[in-house]
């Protein structure tokens, strides 16, 4: 039993997430990035992506080019999750879910994950702390 998540965090403590059951595709990623742009209040978004195949798709690349004044995509080197602050959020989510009672359905798992993520979202200092990992210190922006 599993769910998938796409998420983005900011060094200002903002968290955006989307839970889903099937595979990520270009359309879902583009929809997620559009939602992030809408919440940025006219500021340009700088989004760090890992090397998932969909992150490099022609459709996503073309969309990013069309929206380059609103969003800029950066790709991490391959096999370097330690440089992605969002990975620390994912690990924290898994730890929190692991302490809860065993779920019986995917719906219960999704509800629990949503509850934990909403708690994280309400705690901007907690979200910001994902940028405090020693591997990220040289890149931390205040």
Predicted feature descriptions by range:
Residues 1-43:
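Electropositive, glycine- and tryptophan-enriched low-complexity nucleic-acid-binding patches
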Residues 43-49:
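Generic beta-sheet signal
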Residues 49-60, 78-83:
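Acidic, metal-coordinating catalytic cores used for nucleic-acid/nucleotide bond scission
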